[in-house]
Amino acid sequence: MITTQSISDIRAQVKAWRQKGETVAFVPTMGNLHLGHITLVKEAKTRADHVVASIFVNPMQFGQNEDLDAYPRTLAEDQAALTAAGAELLFTPTPEIIYPKGMDAQTYVEVPSISDLLCGASRPGHFRGVATVVCKLFNIVQPDIAVFGQKDFQQLLVIRTMVDDLSMPIEIVGVDTIREASGLAMSSRNGYLSAEQKDQASQIKRSLDKMAESLKAGLAFKDIITQAQTELAEAGFRNDYLEIRNANNFAIADAGDVKLVILVAAYMGSTRLIDNQVVTLNA
């Protein structure tokens, strides 16, 4: 696998592949890779002739009191994992390469409405940072396909909307959440949890499963949410949000909706965890 910080190197290699009529899939990451990321790379490998990955801890999507400096950097381990998974080209730019004028002078991309809800309300400016860097990476790599995890459901929706609104010729693929044996969604931030906290955090998946069954049984949304909030609090969580929304348009769920998504964000200690579950009801 070739690793480079050079935009021109990335473009030259992708151009060479394209001249041979070959396709390119792209997996953007922030590094500190786990099995969830590797699953994305393997999925990308099944969908295109070549896989490009990136590792960039994007300062634009971190808030003032968030963990940018503490975010783990594990490049050597990540390179080995990406090579084993089948990636052929790795882009590892610095902030100065991505934002040569500095972030304050950077043209940005903002997806209205959905960027201000849920994680966007808790983390103002977060999705502007995500959309801007993903748009820039797409322009650098120019992939046919880009692969993302569905654990970040709102992020995936923001990216799909951006691609559609800006008429980008890129297929966006969402991959099911990969979980630890306990049911806890794999996340780089799980490394901040103690063994006891990890055990407590597995309550998220149990509550999501219970909520899904209650939705299928026709129970009232408000009652379902209240019960789950109680369960999570008893497990040691501090609630950020727990909502049921229409999975297609992200509106607050209505009784007539068929495809729903349950979205949760909660703190275990100082670590913020997110998860979701899509539920399809009988029409």
Swiss-Prot record:
User: Known EC number(s)?
Assistant: 6.3.2.1
Q: Name one GO cellular component term.
A: cytosol
Where is ATP bound in this sequence?
A: 30-37, 149-152, 178, 186-189
Catalytic center at which residues? Answer: 37
Gene for this chain: panC
In this chain, beta-alanine is annotated as bound at 61
Keyword Cytoplasm belongs to the record: yes
- The protein in question is named Pantothenate synthetase
Query: Cross-referenced NCBIfam families, in alphabetical order?
Result: cyt_tran_rel (TIGR00125), panC (TIGR00018)
**Record carries keyword Nucleotide-binding:** yes
Q: What else is known?
A: The reaction proceeds by a bi uni uni bi ping pong mechanism.
